[in-house]
Every structure is written in C-alpha cells, then in structure tokens.
C-alpha cells in the first residue's frame, strides 16, 4: 500500500511511517510531496494521506497523527504503544495533552536528524527509525516495571 504526507519530515511524519511499517503494513511505500500536492498525488497514486490537514490520519484537537493511526488500527490495546503515543504527541504538539517529560528529548533528537545533511525524507526516516525502536523498547520496559506513565513520573 502507498502512504503519503507532506515533505520535510518532523516528529509525527517520522513516527507514523515507523508505526505503519512495523505494525500495520510491512510492505508500505511512503511518498512525501509539497503540502499543496498531497491530496492530488494521493488520489492519483491511490495512497493514504497522513499528517496533513483535514484527513482521517491527521491532527484532531490536541491529538497528533500518530494518535490517529494508533486508534484507527487498534494498536491502543498495547499499553507500551499508549505510552509511546503520549511521548510522540508531546514531541509533536505543545505537550499540553499529557505533559509527557520524555517528549522534549524526542523532539530534540528528531530536530537534530533534520540537520545531519541527509538528502531527503526517506533517508531521515531510515536513520531515525532506530530511535523509534529504542523508544518503544523503553516504553515496553516501563510497562513491565508498572510505570505506566514512564520513568520520570
């Protein structure tokens, strides 16, 4: 399946493809185009849009696109995924929904990846997905240790 978003990835547009590839669609193909072209290219390519305005898998209220993907694909039954969603949400928004302390660190690391001189969004995603793997492992460990809100609470 094809998935599409706007170019120049940030936290949510890195976390969503990681989530999709790892838990929903292992054969996913990701497209990133200028924001004004997303819907036209999505229609032409039969691609699912995410993290763009006015789409199902976008921001809704204080929830980010990662939240929308987690809910739509029923990944919210996993407590570690719920903790990860709180962290991603806080990193991608003003962090007022959950006030998750780990969010600032994720935002900082994600912003750093944008300044490594990587050529395009695909390279940024490929490089940064190890961070998502590590963060999900952290969330799993927090849940095993009965720290449902992370280690900083």
Please provide the spans of the model-predicted regions:
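A charged, amphipathic interaction segment
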Residues: 71-153
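Conserved, aromatic- and glycine-enriched, well-ordered alpha/beta core segments
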Residues: 2-6, 13-80
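Active-site-proximal structural scaffolding
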Residues: 12-13, 125
């Amino acid at each position: 399946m094809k998935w599409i978003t706007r170019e120049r990835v940030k936290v949510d547009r890195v976390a969503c493809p990681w989530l999709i590839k790892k838990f929903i669609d292992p054969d996913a193909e990701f497209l990133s185009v200028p924001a004004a072209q997303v819907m036209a290219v999505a229609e032409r390519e039969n691609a699912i849009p995410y993290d763009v305005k006015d789409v199902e898998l976008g921001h809704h209220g204080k929830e980010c696109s990662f939240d929308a993907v987690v809910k739509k694909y029923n990944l919210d039954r996993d407590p570690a995924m719920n903790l990860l969603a709180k962290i991603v949400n806080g990193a991608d928004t003003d962090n007022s929904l959950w006030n998750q302390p780990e969010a600032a660190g994720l935002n900082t690391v994600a912003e750093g990846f944008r300044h490594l001189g990587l050529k395009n969004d695909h390279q940024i995603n490929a490089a940064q997905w190890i961070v998502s793997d590590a963060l999900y492992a952290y969330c799993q460990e927090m849940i095993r240790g009965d720290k449902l809100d992370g280690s900083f609470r």
